Amino acid sequence: MPRGQKSKLRAREKRHQARCENQDLGATQAPVAEGESSSSANLLFGDRPQNLPAAETLSIPEALQGAPSTTNTIAPVSCTSSNEGASNQDEKSLGSSREAEGWQEDPLSKKVVSLVHFLLQKYEKKEPITKGDMIKFVIRKDKGHFNEILKRASEHIELAFGVDLKEVDPIRHYYAFFSKLDLTYDETTSDEEKIPKTGLLMIALGVIFMNGNRAPEEAVWEIMNVMGVYADRKHFLYGDPRKVMTKDLVQLKYLEYQQVPDSDPPRYEFLWGPRAHAETSKMKVLEFVAKMHDTVPSAFPSCYEEALRDEEQRAQARVAARAHTAAMANARSRTTSSSFSHAK
């Protein structure tokens, strides 16, 4: 793998180590990803939550992505945060230097990067994932830190692809990937497509929600471009990204793609489709977005409040549905009893 590509995944590991060792520093400005300007990072973030770095770098390995990757982050445009304030330049410099020192002193970071690639290669080859193989081929003498290394590697994969790595056999220590959201999209795709396209869908849903529940097409592609996914370029895994976004996911009713009313020349926008509303929730998507920003959902106050309202409405709908089901069951029971009595 090219050195520049590996450095992008390591950048996040630097920040992880720096945060662990420098909790007293508060918010510091994370270095912008290699090959990326500060202005482009700010453009992608828009109004970001309080005390968050302007860029959180996550690399999708080139062997699986087929295109350079920089910042894999959703732009919260409508979800403004309260009391936003940027760290001063001295804090930025101090934070960056501490991060660099932390990276040099943290040998586990290299293991994390290697394990990410190992796990994704296992997925690509459809080979079983076992604890024994992870220790034998990657972790080796650092097996005492297995849990920490696996946790950090799993977080990278979760943010890149929207999946969790879970132990499915605690006796033989077998692991498998599972979709992070309750999406049945996995069931409609081949094993080869399952993980990457689910991640693409999750990010699209996040962009839409964070842009006021309807995202201009250009805003969605801006984020996708940063991931190395372009509307007019064939992608190693996604194939034709424009077709995936504007046709495949639309036909599956996960997304809606429509012309902006009264736009001249015509402009288009994305919305959540009915299947997305049915199979996931705003809170789950917000939790995913918050994790990408290394924060909590409440760091986006307006979106958090909207997600809470959505959760309450869903809970009320479930209660009403159960009550309706119970009433129907009682009615059928009474009808059956009445018919039986008349028969006698």
UniProtKB/Swiss-Prot annotation:
Biased composition (Basic residues): 1-17
Keywords: Cytoplasm, Tumor antigen, Ubl conjugation pathway
Low complexity composition-biased segments: 324-334
Subcellular location: Cytoplasm
Domain MAGE, chain residue ranges per copy: 108-307
GO biological process, one term: negative regulation of transcription by RNA polymerase II
A UniProt-annotated Pfam family: MAGE_N
PROSITE patterns: MAGE (PS50838)
Top-level taxon: Eukaryota
Function of the protein: May enhance ubiquitin ligase activity of RING-type zinc finger-containing E3 ubiquitin-protein ligases. Proposed to act through recruitment and/or stabilization of the Ubl-conjugating enzyme (E2) at the E3:substrate complex.
Quaternary assembly: Interacts with LNX1.
Name of the molecule in the record: Melanoma-associated antigen B18
Organism, scientific name: Macaca fascicularis (Crab-eating macaque)
Lineage of the species this protein comes from: Eukaryota, Metazoa, Chordata, Craniata, Vertebrata
Gene designation: MAGEB18
